[in-house]
């Protein structure tokens, strides 16, 4: 039914959002490490 399709779509979007969030956090941590290294 359409409800199951809707649920699958939300699931996919949620997974994509989670992946993007994890990537953003990883990039932010890397940037913080670089900044700390530059400061010495």
From Swiss-Prot:
Name listed for the protein in its UniProt record: Sarcotoxin-1D
Keyword Oxidoreductase belongs to the record: no
Keywords: Antibiotic, Antimicrobial, Immunity, Innate immunity, Secreted
Main location (coarse class): secreted
Recorded superkingdom: Eukaryota
Disulfide bridge map: none
Role played: Sarcotoxins, which are potent bactericidal proteins, are produced in response to injury. They are cytotoxic to both Gram-positive and Gram-negative bacteria.
Location(s) in or outside the cell: Secreted
One protein family per Pfam: Cecropin
Any single Gene Ontology cellular-component annotation: extracellular space
Organism, as annotated: Sarcophaga peregrina
BP terms from Gene Ontology: antibacterial humoral response; defense response to Gram-negative bacterium; defense response to Gram-positive bacterium; innate immune response
Cited InterPro entries: Cecropin, Cecropin_insect
Family the entry assigns: Belongs to the cecropin family.
């Amino acid at each position: 039914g359409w409800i199951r399709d809707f649920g699958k779509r939300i699931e996919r979007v949620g997974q994509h959002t989670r992946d993007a969030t994890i990537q953003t956090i990883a990039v932010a941590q890397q940037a913080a490490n670089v900044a700390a290294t530059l400061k010495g």
